[in-house]
Amino acid sequence: ALKIYPGRALINSISLETEKMEKLLPLAAKYGAMFILLPLSDAGLPKDVEEKKQIINTIYDKALSLGMAHEDIVVDGLVATIGANPKAAIECYETIAYCKDEKKLPTICGLSNISFGLPERMYVNTAFLTMAICKGLTMAIANPSQELLMNAAFASDMLLDRPDSDIAYIERMSRLAEEKAQYETVVVKKSDNDASASNGTCAAGSKDAVFQAVLKGNKGSIIDEVKKMLSDGAKPDEIINN
């Protein structure tokens, strides 16, 4: 796959597990790919942050010895579920801060892991994301359609004075406001139409019946419905055009 990939690949992921280290790391170096450094070993999950740092350093040093560059490496914060490990978030924050402040490496993490098994997971994920960004998180694996999560990310970047983050936040909020206004306009129009129908407006009911008859190809009822509209005062061109 690396031979034919049209661009620079990002391998997800390479850990200290023997099979991955021996096979994938040399391939990444050979084909100039970036890779996500996953701080796991043959022993499984690291028992604490210090062991996680040791794994990161071991893989990092091995990558450089194969000719890879510092810029080729992105570290996975390795998020565990807080339901199983109450210190999961804190340990991830410490890992992110270590990579940012001491190793000068970018970081990534899967947000949803932190809240697995908990109710109303979106609030946990959002709080976790904002705190991780503050610690230096570079990238996150998340659902971009989740509005609360994305808004928090844009706001966090702005509060940390990241380049052009204020413009990005304002533009996003403006777009969301426009979308909300359009939605409310549609709802109001629908409510008005419903109110008109509930007040016994026969023309509206007949108009809808004609539309449904045309839509469904119901030839048997369309003539009677058109006649009803005409008797209610509708003009022929209005029936055709509307």
Tell what function each PLM region has.
Residues L2-E71, T81-I108, S112-N242:
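ATP-dependent carboxylate/acyl-activation modules
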Residues L78:
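Short, well-ordered beta-to-alpha junction loops that form the rim of enzyme active sites
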